[in-house]
Amino acid sequence: MESVLLSARCTANTATVFWNKPENANADTVYEVSLDGGHSVHTNRTHYTFTELIPNTEYCVTVYNIGSIRICTSPARHRIYVTEEPYNAVGDGKTLNTAALQQAFTDCGPNDEVYFPAGIYLTGALDLHSCMAVYLEKDAVLQGSSDPTDYLPRIWSRFEGTEQECYRSLLNAGQLDHTAGANCENILLYGKGTISGGGHVLAERMIDIERENLREYLAQNAALVATCENDRTIPGRVRGRLINLSNCSRIRITGLTLQNGAAWNVHMLSLIHISEPTRLAL
């Protein structure tokens, strides 16, 4: 049997197994995968996710002609329901829930997860912290507002290689310091829902505000502006992202749809140990 590395990432109820593509594989190669020797599934990808598993339980996953790996699901987390006391967030797509959601995030301990049932939860910028989890149920949408003032105060960030103050992103983890290591770690963002930003409307509003702030600078540096794509390029560097991860370690994002960032959907700065990209809506 060819020796090809297998690895896995688990939650309480799911396990995703990854393997390296064998040298003799091609685009038509189909892999046979089984859990504890049970019914086999087939995939043409080099990963597979098992669902509806039992928390805190060991399993053996076999990828035939590749190898086997023993895995263990994590213990079930205590759920902090954002719609219940003392948070009472409203998923109507109209009520601004920033304060309530931030409190739920702040209260989330290492064995907890902030839980969003189905609904559209309008919010401004939210701060993540080490050792926490966020779960979005199917049809749950964490919806960023389109008002730039909901993303203040600005934070130190980097845009196209230039460090500067930028609007906060919808989700923010860590503080940027290119001279130091990780200052935020062990965050899990997962589920079946969607994280959606303020999109083009928010981006244009942020740019308009910054153009006014930089009016004199842009006028005095017309030659520099002329080298840019257009006169909105320099002001556009203040835009927040959908998810901003700065100086973070061991971040996992899985199962979610990410869409409509005012700039990039996921911006990773000075990071290590990032796993499982999620679905990006184009």
Predicted regions: what they are:
Residues 1-115, 122-123, 129-133, 137-246, ...:
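Extracellular "leader-to-stem" segments immediately downstream of a signal peptide or signal-anchor
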Residues 272-282:
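Single conserved hydrophobic/aromatic residue that forms the stacking wall/gate
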